[in-house]
Amino acid sequence: MPSTPWLPPQAAAAVRAAVLEAVRRYHRHDVLIDAEPPREPVLFVGNHGFGTVTDPNVLAVAASLRQRARQQTYLVHDMAWTLGVGGLVAAFGGAPASEESAVEAWTHGRDVVVFPGGDREAGKSWRDRNRVMFNGRSGFARLAMDHDKAVVPVVTAGAGEGAFVLTDGERLASAVGLDRALRYKVLPVSLSVPWGLSVGLSGLLPYLPLPSKLVTAILPPMRPAAGEDAAGFAQRVEDAMQSRMDDLVANRIPLLG
């Protein structure tokens, strides 16, 4: 599944820097560091806003980690490779979401970044825009436990306001076989730029998010408690992220921040 990056490293770095600077300006992005991450390679765990690889939350996390000495590998849904854009994802540090990809990154001294909510969180409706939704997924916690890596939660508020999602379209995705063809379980019905009212387009394809203010908080590192299993650890991470999200949006005005 891994593919050759479409861009040479220097070109990819230049494009990445330009995009992240654009995100900082367009979204008036603020970064709050609740605690400095450990110096050694870690597992950063983020939440989705809306969309897949073009989700502003993914870009916000990348922008938040720009000054870190280590590079990051982003674990990405294999749909990117199914659709033939794996080379583009790889050029910007993406790799198929697997234990093998994570271990390879850590072996080379890179951090790993994962968004456990996956497609369901990335396609959530407007009413759920401020919810962290891992849907019982605990693979990331097991990964960190098996390889003795700290989990560093990263929470971003605001990206769910970049489009108006009427419904996640989970039943529709199942009806048309999207879950079987691409392992993608939602087909959002949304209003977005440039797609207007669409079914699935702004979830699967790039869209121009509205200029909502983004705020990212980097939380203190977390490790499993004595006797805690992966499910319990994952739930504790999700709860910590939701608590921080609640703080970030307590007095928030949509789009304005």
Segments (PLM) and residue ranges:
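Non-catalytic C-terminal accessory region of glycerolipid acyltransferases
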Residues: P2-V15, E104-G257
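Membrane-anchoring hydrophobic helices of lipid-metabolizing enzymes
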Residues: M1-S101, G169, G203, D246-G257
